[in-house]
């Protein structure tokens, strides 16, 4: 094999890698202010894909004074292993998820690591059970600060921050304070299954 062909092959491989990574990182990022005291900067309600993505972005921006809570047990957050009836996601498989542009974190990278690149190419739509497995891996590999079995029962103004009442599965309640609260309770979170009174009044 001559040097020209070797260089051409290496360049083609590099260009393929560049295309792959650009495809994986096509996602915006946002800045957030740093933590300044013991009050949580952000309380995230819901540890499904949206809640995990918000937590990851905050941690990337060095906002570590956050907490994510979900009333479901670990692995049962979101609809994927509970009430989702469709066998696959409805989004195109190449659409970015909670990875925030990190090339090794998209579903595609995880899928290819588990099943191979050929399997990814043959895949039409992502099966919901595999998506749930991916989200479990995403949460674990990033060590996101999620507390399961914790429900938010009340949000109240506390003079410059929000007082959130948290109830554990054993019924024990406590109040935490946060500057911001993100309701990441799913697509229907503001649709009607459960709606906090302050949101219903909007």
Q: What are the functions of these language-model segments?
A:
Residues 148-162:
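A conserved short coil-to-beta-strand element within the FAD-binding core of flavoproteins
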Residues 168-169:
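PAS-family sensory domains
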Residues 50, 74, 188:
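Conserved Rossmann-like nucleotide-cofactor binding loop
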